[in-house]
C-alpha cells in the first residue's frame, strides 16, 4: 500500500522534492527565509543523511521510502527511521499547505469533520490543542483510522504511516517550521496554519482515495 504518491519516493538515491509553489507566495504569513531554511536546509539534510546511511545497504536501496520507514520501524533502526520518516513527513507537509489556503472547507471532508468532531469549529479547537500541546518537537496530524477522522500528535520523526494510519493533513510543530517568523509563539503559528495555509483539496483527495 502506498499512503501518498506525493510523499513516497520509489528508490535510492532519494532527492529533495521541489516545493509545489513559489515560496514568495506565503507572504505576509511566512517569509521566503523560512522556506529557505525549512526546505532547503532541514529537509535537504534528512535526504543527504538517509542516502549516506543507505550507501552500503543494497537491499534497502531497492525499497521505496515508505518500505524503508516500515523496515526501520520494525527493526528498531532509529537513524534510518528518523531520516526516512522526516523526508516523508516534510514532503507530505509541503502538500498540506498552499498559498491563500485555510478557512472552512466544503464537500466530503466537511461532512466527515462535522460527523466526527461535531462542527468545523470543534475540529479547529481540537487540532490547535493537539498541535500546541505537543511537548518539544513533533507533528500534529489529521488521520482517517477505524472509519473516522482522528487528530493525533507524534514526537520527533514519528509518522502515522508507521502505525498503519492513513494521514490526511500534517502540521509541522518543530521549531524550525516557525521560529524565523513567529519565534516561540507556536499558538500564533498554528492559528495561521488553520486560517490561511491548509490545502483542503489535498486533505479531501487523501480522504477519498
Swiss-Prot record:
Database matches in SUPFAM superfamilies: Fe,Mn superoxide dismutase (SOD), C-terminal domain (SSF54719), Fe,Mn superoxide dismutase (SOD), N-terminal domain (SSF46609)
Keywords associated with the record: Iron, Manganese, Metal-binding, Oxidoreductase
Record-listed Fe(3+) binding positions: 38, 90, 172, 176
Catalytic activity: 2 superoxide + 2 H(+) = H2O2 + O2
InterPro entries: Mn/Fe_SOD (IPR001189), Mn/Fe_SOD_BS (IPR019833), Mn/Fe_SOD_C (IPR019832), Mn/Fe_SOD_N (IPR019831), Mn/Fe_SOD_N_sf (IPR036324), SOD_C_sf (IPR036314)
Cofactor info, note text: Binds 1 Mn(2+) or Fe(3+) ion per subunit.
A UniProt-annotated Pfam family: Sod_Fe_N
Alphabetical list of Gene3D superfamilies matching this protein: Fe,Mn superoxide dismutase (SOD) domain, Iron/manganese superoxide dismutase, C-terminal domain
GO MF, any single term: superoxide dismutase activity
UniProt-annotated binding residues for Mn(2+): 38, 90, 172, 176
Required cofactor(s): Mn(2+); Fe(3+)
Main enzyme class: oxidoreductase
EC number: 1.15.1.1
Record PROSITE patterns: SOD_MN
Family, as annotated: Belongs to the iron/manganese superoxide dismutase family.
Role this protein plays: Destroys superoxide anion radicals which are normally produced within the cells and which are toxic to biological systems. Catalyzes the dismutation of superoxide anion radicals into O2 and H2O2 by successive reduction and oxidation of the transition metal ion at the active site.
Protein name: Superoxide dismutase [Mn/Fe]
Gene this protein is translated from: sodB
Amino acid at each position: 500500500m502506498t499512503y501518498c504518491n506525493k510523499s513516497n519516493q520509489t528508490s535510492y538515491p532519494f532527492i529533495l522534492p521541489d516545493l509545489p509553489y513559489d515560496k514568495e507566495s506565503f507572504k505576509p504569513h511566512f517569509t521566503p527565509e523560512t522556506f529557505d531554511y525549512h526546505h532547503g536546509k532541514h529537509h535537504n539534510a534528512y535526504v543527504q543523511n538517509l542516502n549516506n546511511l543507505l550507501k552500503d545497504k543494497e537491499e534497502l536501496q531497492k525499497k521505496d521510502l515508505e518500505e524503508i520507514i516500515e523496515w526501520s520501524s520494525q527493526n528498531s533502526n532509529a537513524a534510518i527511521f528518523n531520516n526516512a520518516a522526516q523526508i516523508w513527513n516534510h514532503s507530505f507537509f509541503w502538500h498540506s499547505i498552499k498559498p491563500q489556503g485555510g478557512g472552512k472547507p466544503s464537500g466530503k471532508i466537511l461532512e466527515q469533520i462535522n460527523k466526527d468532531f461535531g462542527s468545523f469549529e470543534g475540529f479547529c479547537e481540537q487540532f490547535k490543542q493537539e498541535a500546541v500541546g505537543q511537548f518539544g518537537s513533533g507533528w500534529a496530524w489529521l488521520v482517517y483510522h477505524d472509519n473516522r477522522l482522528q487528530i493525533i500528535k507524534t514526537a520527533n520523526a514519528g509518522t502515522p504511516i508507521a502505525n498503519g494510519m492513513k494521514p490526511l493533513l500534517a502540521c509541522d510543530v518543530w521549531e524550525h517550521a516557525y521560529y524565523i517568523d513567529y519565534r516561540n509563539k507556536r499558538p500564533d503559528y498554528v492559528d495561521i496554519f488553520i486560517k490561511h495555509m491548509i490545502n483542503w483539496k489535498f486533505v479531501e483527495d487523501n480522504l477519498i482515495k
